[in-house]
Amino acid sequence: VLMTEVTNKLTAIKPDILIEFRQPYIGPVMRKYGNMFRGVDAPNNAVANKIETTNLRILSQNTAVHSDMFIWRPEENVEQAALQILNILYSVPQLSVRLEDIPEDHLNMIRYWFKYWNNNKHILMDGKFIPSNPAANYPWLSAIANQKQITTLYEDVVVTLDHNAKQIDLINAKASASVVFKLEHKSNAAIKIIDCKGNIVFEKNQN
């Protein structure tokens, strides 16, 4: 009753008010009272942030799920820093790095991935969300919409591509450089490999 009264009074003042709830006191019923859910504290722990935001995505239906604030050390290489973003790609990112303290390649990486997220948020947040194997901490995650598939790999697994997808983004968020995927039928494809700062490192049309 108290939560209903609080919600009603707040929305009467501001109909589009944002009300956030955080783990661990979140469940499907809380969608009645809040329109933002946020993962539990995961300081400098990309894997924990991924697990908690994915758990929330499974429970929250169309309620916006926000990551916990993520940071990294300025002396980390840019690939390691990028993992903080790639592990929460299927939630609303909450960057907590002091931009004036990080090197230029880190800034370029942030610009690239935040632009990517904004351009693809209708897929990442509103598309068909496919989490894999929760017992293994979700070794890959996918989202599909409008004939586009976005799959992020966190472990060395073989990805099966959606046969209806006309564009597929495979994102490598693991320690090894190799990515293995399986096509279910012959197809013509244009292959482009991009580094974590958005630079094209390989491009080929496959007939």
Where are these regions (language model features)?
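Active-site-proximal substrate-binding groove within the catalytic cores of carbohydrate-active enzymes
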Residues: 2-206
